[in-house]
Design a protein with these regions (language model features):
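Amphipathic alpha-helical scaffolding segments comprising HEAT/armadillo-like alpha-solenoid repeats
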Residues: 1-8, 26-38, 55-68, 84-95, ...
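Conserved hydrophobic register position within alpha-solenoid helical repeats
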Residues: 17-20, 48, 78, 105, ...
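Long, ordered, amphipathic alpha-helical scaffolds
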Residues: 163, 169-209
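Non-membrane alpha-helical segments in proteins
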Residues: 19, 42-54, 72-80
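Alpha-helix N-cap/helix-start positions at coil->helix boundaries
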Residues: 11-15, 42-43, 70-73, 99-100, ...
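Hydrophobic, well-structured mid-protein blocks that either form specific transmembrane helices
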Residues: 92-114
Length: 209
């Protein structure tokens, strides 16, 4: 019973610290956000990252700490921050062992709009080979957002994945053109999943306007 009470108290204490750092940040004081970056509660550390990122106050040392944090909640917060901060390496996050981190990192990669070979290659690998369907879906969406022809083949292959990934892959074809794209859309128009068919119909109509 004692451990349960300790856990409850720890949770309450963590919530209070998060509230404190957020309130001070609203007043322009980031001191607690920096102090709590090494807090014992991962939710507090994650909140520190979010607050510092919103205030453009994540320096190289803090970024390094966040990327190597042992808890996925913290690395997830880093992935969200990466969407608006190109100093945060999405490549590191894309190779994370936790699928939730990878999913967010894929989204961040699409938001960063960096189109180097490594990003395209890693996203393509996730889109086709990751065990988690949400990661594959997020990677396909990122490749579509980047609109780089080097990612097109992976998007086309993803149109043969499970329904949720197929739908995302069809939408991701929007920036591209060519016979392969036309053929993929034509095939999607008769897909067994109605949402895939709808996505293909909408995109076909859009491209013909």
């Amino acid at each position: 019973m004692g451990s349960e009470e300790d856990s409850l108290e720890f949770t309450r204490s963590g919530i209070e610290r998060r509230q404190q750092l957020v309130q001070l940040a609203r007043e322009g004081d980031l001191s607690l956000a920096r102090e709590f970056f090494s807090d014992d509660d991962p939710r507090v550390r994650a909140s520190s990252i979010a607050v510092l990122s919103e205030n453009d106050a994540l320096d190289e040392s803090l970024i390094a700490l966040g990327l190597s944090d042992r808890h996925p909640l913290v690395r997830m917060s880093m992935a969200r921050a990466a969407a608006q901060n190109s100093s945060i390496s999405v490549l590191t996050l894309l190779s994370d062992e936790d699928p939730a981190v990878v999913e967010i990192a894929c989204w961040a990669a699409g938001e960063q709009t960096e189109r180097n070979d490594s990003i395209i290659e890693v996203l393509s690998g996730i889109a086709l080979e990751h065990d988690d369907a949400l990661c594959r879906e997020s990677a396909v969406a990122a490749l579509g957002a980047l609109g780089d022809v080097r990612g097109l083949e992976s998007i086309l292959e993803a149109t043969q994945d499970i329904a949720t990934v197929r739908r995302r892959a069809v939408i991701a074809l929007a920036p591209f053109e060519g016979q392969a794209v036309t053929d993929a859309l034509q095939l999607a128009l008769s897909d067994r999943d109605w949402q895939v068919r709808q996505a293909a119909e909408d995109l076909t109509k859009y491209l013909s306007e």
